[in-house]
Amino acid sequence: MDPVCLESIQLMSTNTPLLQAERVSVSFGGLRALHDVYLQLNHNEVVGVIGPNGAGKTTLFNAICGLVTPDSGTFSFEGKQRSWPRTDQLAELGIARTLQGVGLFPDLTVLENVMIGAQKFAKTGLISASFGRNTKDEAELMDRSMTALERVYAGALANRRANTLSYPDTKRVAIARALVSEPQVLMLDEPAGGLGPQDIEWMNGFIRNLTSHMSVLIVEHHMDVVMSVCDRLYVLNFGEVISSGVSDDVRRDPAVIAAYLGTGA
C-alpha cells in the first residue's frame, strides 16, 4: 500500500473517537436520572465526568458498563454504533472498570484476587478457551496477574490477604485486577475517594502515565481532584451536561461554579 494512503488511514483511525455515548436518557420509576447526555472519549486521553451528588455521574458510568439499560441513546465504540454493552461483553470490547466499592474478596490473597480478573478475561475467548486448565496455563495466568500488580507498584503485596490491606492499597489492587485484561478503556469510579493528598497525587500521576497505552474515563465528585489529570471534563447536574471542554475552561464556567456552590445550574 502507498505509504501516504497508509498514513491517512492511521490518522483517520486516531481521529475517530474511541467511545461515544449520545443523547443518553435514563429514568428510574418515572424519575429522570439522565436526559440527553453525551460523552466522547478519544484515544490516549483522560476524560473526567464530574458533578455534585445526585448529578447522574454514576448512572452514566453504569450505563456504559452494562449495569443500567438506557431508555434511549446510542453507544459507539471505535467508530461503530453498537447495542449498549452487557457487563459480560466489556472485556471483549476492550473496556475494564473499577467500582467505587472496590469489591475485593477479603479472605483471598491479593494475587488470587487479581487472578480472578484474569480468569474472567479468559472466559471471553480472547485467551485460549483452555486457558487456566493446566499447570502451564495457571503459571501464565499468575505471570499476567503479577505483571498487573507490578504496574501499580503492588507486587510486594501479592501474598497478603485482601482484608489486611490499607484502603489506598485496596484501590491499587482493584486497578491491577482491571488492567490484567489489557483494556483500551479503563473506567474508574471515584478513584480518589477516601484517599489522602499524597495518595491522590500518586493516583493522578499513575493515571496520566496509562495514556500511552489506553484511554481513561473517570467519574469523580470533587473537581479539584481531577483537574490536574484530565484532558477534558464533562460536568453533570440534575442529569444533564451543563458544561464540557478542557479543564481550565470548565472550571471558570459560571454554570459549573453555581452548581458546586449549590445556587442552581
Q: What are these model-predicted stretches?
A:
Residues 50-52:
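The feature captures the beta-strand-to-loop junction immediately N-terminal to the Walker
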Residues 65:
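Helix-to-loop junction immediately C-terminal to a conserved catalytic motif
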Residues 125-157, 205:
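Conserved ABC ATPase "signature" region
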Residues 182:
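Conserved catalytic motifs of ABC-family nucleotide-binding domains
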Residues 186-190:
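Catalytic Walker B motif of ABC-type/P-loop ATPase nucleotide-binding domains
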Residues 200-212:
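Helical segment within the ABC ATPase nucleotide-binding domain
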